[in-house]
Amino acid sequence: MSSLFPFIFLFLFSFLTSFRASAQDPRFLAYYCPNATTYSSNSTYLTNLKTLLSSLSSRNASYSTGFQNATVGQALDRVTGLFLCRGDVSPEVCRNCVTFAVNNTFSRCPNQREAVFYYEECILRYSHKNILSTAITNEGEFILRNPNHISPIQNQINQFTNLVLSNMNQIAIEAADNPRKFSTIKTELTALQTFYGLVQCTPDLSRQNCMNCLTSSINRMPFSRIGARQFWPSCNSRYELYDFYNETAIGTPPPPLPPLASPSLSDKSGNSNVVVVAVVVPIIVAVLIFIAGYCFFAKRAKKTYGTTPALDEDDKTTIESLQLDYRAIQAATNDFSENNKIGRGGFGDVYKGTFSNGTEVAVKRLSKTSEQGDTEFKNEVVVVANLRHKNLVRILGFSIEREERILVYEYVENKSLDNFLFDPAKKGQLYWTQRYHIIGGIARGILYLHQDSRLTIIHRDLKASNILLDADMNPKIADFGMARIFGMDQTQQNTSRIVGTYGYMSPEYAMRGQFSMKSDVYSFGVLVLEIISGRKNNSFIETDDAQDLVTHAWRLWRNGTALDLVDPFIADSCRKSEVVRCTHIGLLCVQEDPVKRPAMSTISVMLTSNTMALPAPQQPGFFVRSRPGTNRLDSDQSTTNKSVTVSIDDKSMSDLDPR
């Protein structure tokens, strides 16, 4: 009888929660804030913007059609906005997405006169410009790639490219001719594989403008992947080899939204129908859930795991779905051959692997003598499994086999940032524009962890070797073995076990075990200074009594010679105003008082807005004073038995960064 308890619990829990599934928050993808112009607090523009957003998210908005636009105000204070819901979603899902997007507008793009917010189910957009009936294809682009490549054989690549173009161009024509400016396609490739495509324009566009926008969108998609999507503010396109849209909703008129008021009790026949539905539907759902639960536990009992990683970027990942067969990983890495080794990460070696289906992966094999225990291992899996952001490396699976613990990640072509930044033979490949792009990408990734993901995550080990670079030199934050999850209202946590890397750790964490979002901000500041200078913080050669990079940068700033910090490889080609501003931001991040360090949301605005005034930086943490006998704080060393001389404010800190 006791063996039935898991099923009974699953049944009751699923029954009680199944009716709340539709109320989950929409999946946020990206936002675009050009920061060309801003508005001030209490301005007429802000008042008009609030009125506009209220109108777009009102109960009377056009959720059934999935599109609405509005304009509020006059002349320079005029603001125009719109929402566009994906053509296959229900009015209720549309309303939920738009309302959620409106409620998060000011936290994502504060004080911006123009913005676009991309969600899985909808797009929200506003601007001080006239954005209606105009196809925008030169700004606000966002691309998502399925991490799985198609076969490397050239003729298969050409065949697949032709297939994608043929199908996508066909539905682009259909969408342009459709009043809803929306179309999908389903094409069987083989008995086991089907192609799915979707395109959509905002319905205010003319046929020609919609066609031009979709043509641009489709041509910018990476056809080397088995799935991809591209967004412009005015249109978007997507293809996959799985069913990602609601086929039953295509071609049928959307049902009306459910009434917000209580129904009348006078219609007896109507009430009887409601009672029947209310009784029958939960029973059917409960039976299906029970069957699914039985299959789930039966599968667990067999202890059989996948032989290749699942790459469906839209499925919510579970620990069970991530567990891979050890022998498959062993074969993918040629039995962890030295020829496959591509580096060393936290707690173990990293190998390149290729699965039988052609998927390239990075395999981290944890050392058997590693300090990372089962807690950290499971923590890394749980933390990373459901994160979805282009500036975070994605976990594809894991394996536990006796003493072996293995993590499988997406393969990132250019390895880590430190391989370029600190190698005299390679650092010349990092032009200033690339370094500036990398700084911005890291900032967006940290902002997602701190604010935009479902959980508040503190990384605790941000450093150059944990920033990976893909084929286009886009940064991806990696190695979440030391990350911690915060509660919704939690701003700080203490620990007696200090983990991380010296030189990147904030003073309050290194000395008192206190960590918060501002600890990651400190690490980000050190990274920014390293990217600008091309020098490691811990290997700094003493100059003018400076014993680390942070101290050196602070003294140059204080002396008015900040440009002397710049890496000689980029000194003649960099934009000096951007370099100085980034140095300024880096020094704000490494200030000794954590309260005075800016939040990542503020940093993102600082990096993209040249009009935002920056406060003067104050003394950094671990600032080395010119006196004999000062111990040096080194990087990449154990934190035990290491004394340092620092100056730290002992008052408690609070983090005001909003979620």
UniProtKB/Swiss-Prot annotation:
<keyword id="KW-0325">Glycoprotein</keyword>
<feature type="modified residue" description="Phosphotyrosine">
    <location>
        <position position="409"/>
    </location>
</feature>
<feature type="glycosylation site" description="N-linked (GlcNAc...) asparagine">
    <location>
        <position position="35"/>
    </location>
</feature>
<dbReference type="Pfam" id="PF07714">
    <property type="entry name" value="PK_Tyr_Ser-Thr"/>
</dbReference>
<feature type="transmembrane region" description="Helical">
    <location>
        <begin position="274"/>
        <end position="294"/>
    </location>
</feature>
<feature type="topological domain" description="Cytoplasmic">
    <location>
        <begin position="295"/>
        <end position="659"/>
    </location>
</feature>
<feature type="modified residue" description="Phosphothreonine">
    <location>
        <position position="501"/>
    </location>
</feature>
<comment type="similarity">
    <text>Belongs to the protein kinase superfamily. Ser/Thr protein kinase family. CRK subfamily.</text>
</comment>
<dbReference type="GO" id="GO:0004674">
    <property type="term" value="F:protein serine/threonine kinase activity"/>
</dbReference>
<feature type="domain" description="Gnk2-homologous 2">
    <location>
        <begin position="142"/>
        <end position="244"/>
    </location>
</feature>
<dbReference type="GO" id="GO:0004672">
    <property type="term" value="F:protein kinase activity"/>
</dbReference>
<keyword id="KW-0677">Repeat</keyword>
<feature type="glycosylation site" description="N-linked (GlcNAc...) asparagine">
    <location>
        <position position="246"/>
    </location>
</feature>
<dbReference type="Pfam" id="PF01657">
    <property type="entry name" value="Stress-antifung"/>
</dbReference>
<dbReference type="InterPro" id="IPR008271">
    <property type="entry name" value="Ser/Thr_kinase_AS"/>
</dbReference>
<dbReference type="GO" id="GO:0106310">
    <property type="term" value="F:protein serine kinase activity"/>
</dbReference>
<feature type="glycosylation site" description="N-linked (GlcNAc...) asparagine">
    <location>
        <position position="42"/>
    </location>
</feature>
<feature type="compositionally biased region" description="Polar residues">
    <location>
        <begin position="636"/>
        <end position="646"/>
    </location>
</feature>
<feature type="glycosylation site" description="N-linked (GlcNAc...) asparagine">
    <location>
        <position position="60"/>
    </location>
</feature>
<keyword id="KW-0418">Kinase</keyword>
<keyword id="KW-0812">Transmembrane</keyword>
<keyword id="KW-0547">Nucleotide-binding</keyword>
<feature type="binding site">
    <location>
        <begin position="342"/>
        <end position="350"/>
    </location>
    <ligand>
        <name>ATP</name>
    </ligand>
</feature>
<feature type="modified residue" description="Phosphoserine">
    <location>
        <position position="465"/>
    </location>
</feature>
<keyword id="KW-0472">Membrane</keyword>
<dbReference type="InterPro" id="IPR017441">
    <property type="entry name" value="Protein_kinase_ATP_BS"/>
</dbReference>
<feature type="compositionally biased region" description="Basic and acidic residues">
    <location>
        <begin position="648"/>
        <end position="659"/>
    </location>
</feature>
<dbReference type="GO" id="GO:0016020">
    <property type="term" value="C:membrane"/>
</dbReference>
<dbReference type="InterPro" id="IPR038408">
    <property type="entry name" value="GNK2_sf"/>
</dbReference>
<feature type="modified residue" description="Phosphotyrosine">
    <location>
        <position position="509"/>
    </location>
</feature>
<feature type="topological domain" description="Extracellular">
    <location>
        <begin position="24"/>
        <end position="273"/>
    </location>
</feature>
<dbReference type="InterPro" id="IPR011009">
    <property type="entry name" value="Kinase-like_dom_sf"/>
</dbReference>
<feature type="active site" description="Proton acceptor">
    <location>
        <position position="461"/>
    </location>
</feature>
<feature type="glycosylation site" description="N-linked (GlcNAc...) asparagine">
    <location>
        <position position="103"/>
    </location>
</feature>
<keyword id="KW-0597">Phosphoprotein</keyword>
<dbReference type="GO" id="GO:0005524">
    <property type="term" value="F:ATP binding"/>
</dbReference>
<dbReference type="InterPro" id="IPR000719">
    <property type="entry name" value="Prot_kinase_dom"/>
</dbReference>
<keyword id="KW-0723">Serine/threonine-protein kinase</keyword>
<keyword id="KW-0675">Receptor</keyword>
<keyword id="KW-0067">ATP-binding</keyword>
<feature type="signal peptide">
    <location>
        <begin position="1"/>
        <end position="23"/>
    </location>
</feature>
<protein>
    <recommendedName>
        <fullName>Cysteine-rich receptor-like protein kinase 7</fullName>
        <ecNumber>2.7.11.-</ecNumber>
    </recommendedName>
</protein>
